[in-house]
């Protein structure tokens, strides 16, 4: 089955895109919100692996670590959508003048900063699991 044509769909449909269509969106030569969304989705995927690794581990605190990873996964998913919306606002502000565009750019910088923070927290949990997690799945963390 063919996917829908490629275009600025991520800002509109975000995480509801098929993986195939999402990857086409990333590669498309269109002005879409992809950089932040890619980082956020990658972070959400990493947090999912951390959660899985923690659930398969038996050390004290593994359950709490899995819950923390789930919160990070949820946050990263939301940030993917927020980043797309912020970029769409920048595109819309281009028609409104310099002041509106500056304000939109300032707001558009917020989701990537939050994505970076979420990724750093996820990496911290992964590092802990790489040391303390179940040996068979440490590499997945």
Task: Describe the predicted segments one by one.
Residues 28-51, 137-141:
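Conserved phosphate/anionic-ligand binding catalytic regions in large, soluble enzymes, centered on
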Residues 18, 22, 45-52, 79-82, ...:
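Amphipathic, well-ordered alpha-helical segments in soluble domains
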Residues 38-45, 65, 72-79, 108-122:
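Amphipathic alpha-helix face/heptad-repeat signature
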Residues 2-17, 41, 118-122:
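Polytopic transmembrane helical bundles with strong interfacial aromatic enrichment
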Residues 59-96:
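A structural-propensity feature for long, helix-poor, extended segments
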């Amino acid at each position: 089955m063919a996917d829908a044509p490629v275009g600025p769909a991520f800002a509109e449909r975000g995480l509801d895109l098929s993986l195939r269509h999402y990857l086409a969106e990333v590669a498309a030569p269109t002005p879409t919100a992809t950089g932040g969304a890619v980082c956020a989705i990658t972070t959400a995927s990493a947090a999912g692996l951390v959660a899985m690794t923690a659930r398969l581990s038996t050390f004290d605190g593994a359950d709490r670590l899995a819950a923390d990873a789930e919160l990070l996964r949820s946050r990263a998913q939301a940030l993917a959508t927020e980043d797309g919306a912020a970029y769409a606002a920048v595109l819309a502000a281009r028609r409104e003048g310099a002041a509106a565009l500056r304000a939109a750019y300032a707001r558009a910088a917020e989701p990537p900063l939050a994505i970076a923070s979420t990724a750093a927290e996820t990496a911290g949990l992964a590092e802990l699991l790489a040391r303390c997690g179940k040996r068979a799945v440490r590499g997945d963390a």
